Amino acid sequence: MPVRRIALISVHTSPLAPMGGAKTGGMNVYIRELSRELGHQGISVDIFTRRSHELDPEIDSSIGENVRVIYLKAGPLLPWTPEEHYGHLSEFTAALMAFAALRNLQYDIVYSHYWLSGWVAAKLKEAWGTRFAHMYHTLGHMKKRIALNARYQPDVRIMTEMQILQSADRIIAATPAEQAQLRWLYRATRKQITVIPPGVNAGHFQKGMSAHEARESLGLKPDGHMLLFVGRIEPLKAVDTILEALHVLRERAPAMLRRLHFMIVGGDPHRGDDREMNRLQAMSVDLGIDRLVSFAGAKEQSELPRYYTAATAVIMPSDYESFGMVALEAMSSGTPVIASQVGGLQFLVRDQETGFHMPAREPISLADCIIQLLSNPGKTASMGLSASRVAKTYAWSEIARRLRRVFDEVADQALKNA
C-alpha cells in the first residue's frame, strides 16, 4: 500500500525555529526540506512539535503544499533543553492523539526524529497500531563518550534509545558509520537498519555571485581568504581547535594571515550567559588572533549561500557528527571542506578530492590543511568543483523517493501481518 499520509514527530524543536540556536541545526533542516519535498511529491505530512512560546500558532502551513507544522501544548510555554522535555512526553502524546481524533485523522506511518520523539512514536504504535520508522540523528552512547555535561541524562536516554530499537519497524541511519554504531553499541541487526543520507537543496546553494563579490558584501577584502565555521556554539563542535590552528599559522606562516579572516556563524555573540561563546571570544584574544576572527551570530538558511560562497574553505573539526549537513551545504556551494574524520563526515567529505580529513582535536594537522589550500589555488578550485559534483548526488527529490520506498515496504509488511 503506497503511503499517502505521514505523521512526522519532532518533539523538542520545530523545523521553523530560527537557525543557529541551542536546539537548532541539521535536524531542523532535514525535517523541513524532506517534508517540503514529500509534499511536492503529493504526500501529506503533519509535523508535530511542542509549543514553547505563546506566539506559536496551532498550525503553520508555510513550509509548502501538503505540509503542516502542528504545535502541541505539553508543559509550560517555555524554551527547554531537549532533556527537559522528557517528563512531559506522555502529555505530548495525549495531545497528539486528541488532535488526530478530533479531526478523524489516520496516518499510514509515523516517522520520528531524536530519542524523545521515538518514545512518542512507540506509544502511538501501542495505541493506534501504526508502524513507525525512526531516525536517531545523534546517539546517547556516542554523546556519553564525547560530550557529557551537567544537564545530560545519559542513562535515561540510552535506555529509551534501546526501547525504540525494539519497537521501531525500521531505523533510518544517515551513514554506514551510524549503522555500525547502532550494531556495535545497541546490538541492532542489519535488517533493522536502512542507510539513507540526508539531502540538499542544490538550487538554493548555487552561486548567485562570485567569491570576490560575496566577500566584499561581508565587509572583507575581496582578494583575501575566508575560513568559515557554521553551526551551534557548543564544545563538541571544537571551534577552539580552529582558533588553535590559527595560532599555529601565526607562528609558522605569519605572511599568510595578512589576507586571512575566520568567520564564526552561529549562536549569539552578545548573549552574556553563553559560556562557550564567551570562552571562544576570550580565547581568540589570549591567542593574539582576535583581529582575524569575527563572530557573526546565527544566520537564517536564506543567508547562508553568501557565506559559503565567500569562504575559501568550511571547517568542521567536530568531535562527533552523525552526518554533517553543513558540509553538504558547503559542498553544494562549491566550497571545499576540512573535516575531522569522525561519524558521517568521513563518508561525506572525500579526502584530497572534495576537501581534507583531519584527526579530531589536532590543530597542527588542521593548520597543515589550511596551508595546503591557501598556497595552492588550483587545487582549491578543483576541490570546489568536485564538491559541487558530489553534492548533486544528494538531491532531496531522490532522497525522498528512497524514503518513500522504505515507508511503503514497512506499511505493506503491516498489512501482511494483519
Regions found by a protein language model. Name each.
Residues 1-69:
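N-terminal subdomain of nucleotide-sugar transferases
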Residues 351-352, 356-363, 372-377:
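Conserved acidic donor-binding segment of nucleotide-sugar-dependent glycosyltransferases
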